[in-house]
Design a protein with these regions (language model features):
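Intrinsic disorder/low-complexity detector
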Residues: 1-64, 90, 95-198, 203-204, ...
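Short coil/turn segments at secondary-structure boundaries
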Residues: 74-78, 113
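N-terminal beta-strand/beta-hairpin edge segment
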Residues: 65-75
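N-terminal glycine/threonine-rich, aromatic-flanked beta-hairpin/loop signature
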Residues: 69, 209-211
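Short acidic-glycine-tyrosine-enriched beta hairpin
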Residues: 83
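Active-site-flanking segments in enzyme catalytic domains
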Residues: 87
Length: 287
């Protein structure tokens, strides 16, 4: 526990909160001990030369079956409560020193930045949250296991190993490897890499790992998005000329869009078959 006589606006580290006694006292959070599951303190942004901060310190807490988001009282913002059953998907990104958590619910969406130096605390909180939010589904249990060793990509192999929980076994999967391409201009010639994508089905969720950041490949880092199977409505094929994408329709009108290269379309179709009860359809662009 950090010293109680320190203003938490001065804290610069993120830390896991294992009990209500570890909550920053100046947040004035009153939670029944029996309902508290876990918490995460995220420090505020460092002030600029005028003393302004882009965002205040926050505490994310798992209380019963709710995700609660509390900001420092000086910000004057009310506590937000998101029932886990309303949570559609989670995004967790780590690129160099920039990390962020994004929670997307039926009527709520918010992003929380942090330094990846403290990623271990964030991962620990997410594991607790997933244990309450995700439940195994029988229809996925009988799928053949997906061997991460077949990825032949160290970055994505490590990212998958770090993302999976202790009792979570990857099942059907699709890895879309990066490609090395060359661009030319009048006086220049340079190589660049296309983004890579890994879609994995586990008994508890559909997981999308990518290094696709704002349309380009992030050399140092990955982004994870995942949702429980009950939140997946359908997989929709989108085509426009030679381009193809797998659109994953989620509850509350949310979706993911995964561009698929021609050489990976058959593998993507096999993954789509896991959701055969939700009819996939080809959607021509512009229709």
């Amino acid at each position: 526990m950090l010293p109680s006589d320190v203003d938490s606006r001065r804290y610069v580290i993120a830390y896991f909160i294992g009990s209500p006694q570890d909550l920053p006292p100046d947040f004035l959070i009153h939670t029944p001990p029996d309902d508290f599951q876990a918490g995460l303190f995220l420090p505020g942004d460092q002030p600029d030369w005028l003393g302004r901060r882009r965002y205040p310190p926050r505490v994310l807490s798992l209380v019963g079956s709710e995700l609660r988001i509390s900001t420092h009282p000086s910000a004057g913002q009310p506590c937000q409560q998101v029932p886990l059953e309303h949570l559609v998907y989670i995004e967790s990104g780590c690129i160099l020193l920039l990390g962020w958590l994004r929670f997307v619910a039926c009527d709520f969406e918010q992003t929380f930045p942090y330094s990846t130096v403290y990623r271990h605390a964030v991962d620990r909180f997410l594991r607790r949250l997933r244990a309450r939010w995700l439940a195994p589904e029988d229809r996925v249990q009988d799928l053949p296991s997906f061997d991460p060793a077949q990825l032949q990509d160290v970055k994505f192999g490590n990212a998958l190993a770090r993302e999976l929980d202790a009792d979570e076994v990857p099942r059907a999967g699709l890895f879309q490897a990066p490609s090395q391409l060359v661009r030319r201009s009048w006086f220049r010639r340079w190589k660049y890499r296309t983004p890579a994508d890994l879609l994995v089905t586990t008994p508890r969720r559909l997981l999308w790992l990518t290094d696709r950041d704002k349309g380009i490949a992030a050399s140092y880092g990955t982004i994870a998005r995942y949702a429980p199977h009950r939140n997946i409505k359908s997989l929709v094929w989108e085509t426009a000329g030679q381009e193809c994408a797998l659109r994953i329709e989620l509850l509350a009108g949310k979706h993911w869009r995964v561009p698929i290269k021609p050489e990976y379309r058959e593998a993507a179709r096999r993954l789509e078959s896991r959701y055969a009860e939700t009819s996939a359809r080809t959607v021509e662009a512009g229709r």
